[in-house]
Swiss-Prot record:
This is DNA polymerase IV. Residues 49-229 form the UmuC domain. One of its GO terms (molecular function) is DNA-directed DNA polymerase activity. Gene3D superfamilies: 3.30.70.270, 3.40.1170.60, 5' to 3' exonuclease, C-terminal subdomain (1.10.150.20), DNA polymerase, Y-family, little finger domain (3.30.1490.100). Binds 2 magnesium ions per subunit.
């Protein structure tokens, strides 16, 4: 739990527009500027752990750069055979969602403007937001290109204001200087800070205090628990469990008996207990992506295309972050929830999808013994700057050719979208990898 050693303030409220502290608890508008955008909470001035998430990030950047799009439904994604990367909130009103097939999105919102993703531009804007976060605290843990956890413990003397005020200033600065909006969740732990940031999008600022955690979670769906994806939520539902409150009545031993080690984790989280610390990005240990399948899989023809798609996802993140990794890590979870991890160290760091995939495939082939898997993941660790990555292979000429081809594919995808070019591994299986249920968050809300 991250708390700031703050002396209790008599005020229990804050205006998000003029940043004045509110002395009355009943007024619906700011006593200084008249704004209705007030934050009130009993623990507002003692909480210091935040989750910051930019709103519909890709679409917001495109609307910023083209004011003519401001009042139009906008979809960022591939062609008719592609998927939605993100949609603005006007498009979401019509039912458009991230990862939706493009033809379905256009059926739902035929008047939508479609723009190909420009990952280079989004990465640049993401770095600007990240720098503003670092101006607040050195304890910034990036989660994706547009979101991060921040720990502002002990920063009140530096900023001459409690974390809630500092975060409200940050939100205004992002909006005024970068031209996009962000939603903020403030709490005492990472899990509930993340939950809070999703409560009032866009331009939200929500607070979940420690005293209210149990009651707040009680009537929420089990899918709100960190790490519970659609597949596990379906398992819980098959057991008659739909709300967190139902799980809160179970003893830790009963949860572990029913769900193994995941049961122990559930017991803590559904009580709002999360001891994870904010880890600054210079201490980032790995970059990974994983997928939980709708149905358990065992055949190579099903698993290999997924591995390829995930390898490309990890590669994109490494390239966007200008980092590389030397150790390839394969993660598998069997149908009975047993976890298998395998790793192999390379001779030099890589950020190439081809090298990640081929090394991961070698590890995967040793595990394909008929076992059915519910989850597959691939990642890299032992990270370093990308300037040391992937030197020319003087022995394997084909590897060098594949690296050149991958660079060309990257340029095409940056220009025309992620689905402009597909490899034989993913294309031949009818894009199986994209039909699975992702447990990582590659498409931002």
């Amino acid at each position: 739990m991250a708390e700031s050693p703050i002396v209790n303030h008599p005020e229990q409220g804050l205006c998000r527009d003029c940043l004045s502290l509110q002395k009355t608890q009943t007024s619906r508008r700011c006593h200084a500027c008249g704004s209705p955008r007030l934050i009130r909470h009993k623990e507002l001035y003692r909480l210091s752990l935040a989750h910051v998430d930019c709103d519909a990030f890709y679409a917001s950047v495109e609307k910023r750069d083209n004011p003519d799009l401001r009042d139009k439904p906008l979809i960022v994604g591939g062609g008719k055979r592609g998927v939605v990367s993100t949609a603005c909130y006007l498009a979401r009103i019509h039912g458009v969602r991230s990862a939706m097939p493009m033809f379905k999105a256009l059926e739902a919102c035929p008047d939508a403007v479609v723009i190909k993703p420009n990952m280079e531009k989004y990465a640049r804007v993401g770095r600007e937001v990240r720098q503003m976060m670092r101006d607040l605290t050195p304890l910034v843990e990036p989660i994706s290109i547009d979101e991060a956890f921040l720990d502002l413990s002990g920063t009140e003397r530096l900023h001459k204001a409690p974390p809630a005020v500092v975060l409200a200033r940050f939100s205004k600065r992002v909006e005024n200087e970068i031209g996009i909006t962000a939603s903020i969740g403030l709490s005492y732990c990472k899990y509930l800070a993340k939950v809070a940031s999703d409560l009032e999008k866009p331009r939200g600022f929500s607070v979940i205090g420690e005293a209210e955690a149990l009651d707040f979670l009680r009537d929420k769906p089990v899918g709100m628990i960190w790490g519970v994806g659609k597949a596990f939520a379906a398992k819980l539902e098959s057991d008659g469990i739909r709300t967190i409150g139902q799980l809160q009545t179970m003893e830790e031993g009963a949860l572990m008996k029913a769900y193994g080690t995941m049961g122990q984790r559930l017991y803590r989280l559904l009580r709002g207990q999360d001891s994870r610390k904010v880890e600054p990005d210079h201490d980032m240990k790995s970059v990974s992506a994983e997928t939980t399948f709708n149905t358990d899989l065992s055949a190579a023809g099903d698993l290999v295309p997924v591995l390829r798609a995930l390898s490309e996802k990890v590669s994109r993140r490494l390239k966007a972050g200008e980092i590389a990794g030397r150790t390839i890590v394969l993660k598998l979870k069997t149908q009975d929830f047993k976890l298998r991890t395998r790793n192999r160290q390379l001779g030099d760091p890589t950020q190439l999808a081809d090298r990640i995939f081929r090394t991961g495939l070698q590890l995967l082939e040793k595990e394909m013994d008929g076992t059915r898997f519910r989850l597959l993941g691939i990642g890299v660790s032992d990270l370093s700057p990308s300037d040391r990555a992937d030197p020319p292979d003087l022995v394997d000429i084909q590897a060098t050719k594949r690296a050149v081809a991958e660079s060309a594919i990257d340029r095409l995808r940056n220009k025309f979208g992620l689905n402009a070019v597909e490899t034989g591994y993913t294309f031949s299986k009818g894009n199986l990898a994209r039909t699975q249920t992702p447990t990582d968050r590659d498409n931002e809300p």
